């Protein structure tokens, strides 16, 4: 929906909500009585905001694109109205909005007066991936102007740095397919409760670089490498022989016990600070054996806690 169209609808008190009927209809019949869940979708241009919005829409969220801040507040008021069935609102915001960072702060402050704390989903990707995507689509960057594409991307990254720092969930789409991005968003937003904590345990290979979205990184290259065992080399850390080999090494189980205890403390602290998402990265040389086995084992231990845990093997299959 266009910004102008939404403005017209809110002024008239009706209108269409995408292809699903009018705003007036969307605000009636059988909604939640206790409030509305709000997610602000933002991030770097070309990083996948549109895909994220489509996934949220498929999950049943009411999605609006590039609304002025005051209309976001009005949409929330519709959701708070008695009988409203708008219980989940996702708004896509980008740097084409004038005074973007100030607008985002205003929205947060305004919604706080309604006892609503909006979550911020921030999507990003590496510079080389963004350049490749823009070149493939033959599009110009919204901040490019008379500059080069790389300069436009750099300007946007600098502008959005404060937003990224305060985001609830950061997803780096550099190495994600559309399917993998959809899976990440579905796991984060499908059927969650407000107080739930979502933990992603991600294995990776140092030879391919650090995960940009990791909250904490642990190196398990202190363990012997199954790559040098002929019978284990073709398999991955998901194979029981490789897993048994890795976990059977001196110090492996002690590491898991200690790291699990440390994460319990960290996760409790994040909960107190209102952070609902955490990515724990575990790395080895190639992301095939040790980090995969340790990530699987750690995720199993975390499942015993009151957490939603998923495992992501970023570099599995790259060798």
Swiss-Prot record:
Record-listed ATP binding positions: 43-50
MF-aspect GO terms: ATP binding; GTP binding
Keywords: ATP-binding, GTP-binding, Nucleotide-binding
InterPro entries noted in UniProt: P-loop_NTPase, RapZ-like, RapZ-like_N, RapZ_C
Region described as Disordered: 1-26
Biased composition (Basic and acidic residues): 1-12
Disulfide bond residue pairs: none
SUPFAM superfamilies: P-loop containing nucleoside triphosphate hydrolases
Superkingdom, natural source: Bacteria
Residues reported in the UniProt entry to bind GTP: 94-97
Entry keyword annotation includes Cytoplasm: no
Family: Belongs to the RapZ-like family.
Summary of the function given for this chain in its UniProt record: Displays ATPase and GTPase activities.
Database matches in NCBIfam families: PRK05416.1
Protein name per Swiss-Prot or TrEMBL: Nucleotide-binding protein Mvan_2698
Naturally occurring in which organism (per UniProt): Mycolicibacterium vanbaalenii (strain DSM 7251 / JCM 13017 / BCRC 16820 / KCTC 9966 / NRRL B-24157 / PYR-1) (Mycobacterium vanbaalenii)
